[in-house]
Amino acid sequence: MLFRSPDMTAQIGRIAATRLAGAARPLRLCYAGPVLKLRADQLRPEREQMQIGAELIGTDSHAAATEIVTVAIEALQGAGVDGITVDFTLPDLVDCLAAGPMPLDAALVGPVRARLVAKDAGGLVALGDAAAAYLPLIEATGPFHAAMERLEAFDAGIGGALATRIAALRAIAKPIGWDITLTLDPTERHSFEYQSWFGFSFFASGFVGEIGRGGCYSIRHPDGRAEPAVGFSLYPDPLIDVGFGQESPRRIFLPLGHDAERAKALRGEGWHTVAALSEADDGPALGCSHYLGGTETRGY
């Protein structure tokens, strides 16, 4: 039997809830490997893809979310990606409002969610007055700071029910550098079906579609207890295909009679060593950019 998963996050959650259930929290785990999508899409028709990610288990506070978002951004920047956009969302926003200050019949919650995701203002109005009250959430979409002002104005009209979430969003955004574009789409649900109060997607200039996503969620333990967590997944195949993250190997030529211990140390530092077997061997011809002179590395 061959089993392939479309998402490693669930497997990491199971490990955290079983084999690592007694480990100190917050628990930080990372992973990488191939996954198989259940269905392809038009933007990415290939079904197999690489998934790289990290999870912080035991809390879904804004401090934990800030750490996760920051680590993901630094990982992309470390691979040479620029023109990064981070899109924030509040996946369970409609459920939260429908159960509180803006009541909806249970049968309406799904249709309201769908029309907000589609930004279908006319369809929302057609659902009735209760659904139409959610129209300002469509307008609270776009560049982060302007969208946040509109979301805050909407929240003021419903008695500040979202004040804690709005403060958390601002706290998460605060340490993100000005070279990163921030946007907000508070009602986006696509690919965030299991996230709770916070979610985010990554985009980069020159690439079609998202290159990663993450957010807060719950892990179910065998005893039924739910544990909060937050994490991210990156899908680096499009980046790898165009050469991001690749490093040219550092090759150093070791002449006859070289210091063997120094050569061993260089290999430990990541150098590719090419040892001479005769006086005729030529470092540059063998693809080396440096040579070992005594105990010093020297460029040709």
What are these regions (language model features)?
Residues T9-A23, L29-V81, L127-Y300:
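Positively charged, Gly/Ser-enriched RNA/tRNA-binding surfaces
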Residues A79, T85-D87, R113:
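Hydrophobic alpha-helical bundle cores within soluble ligand-binding/oligomerization subdomains
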Residues T85-T89, L254-P255:
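Short internal beta-strands
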Residues P91-V125:
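Short terminal or interdomain "cap/linker" segment that borders an active site or interface and mediates
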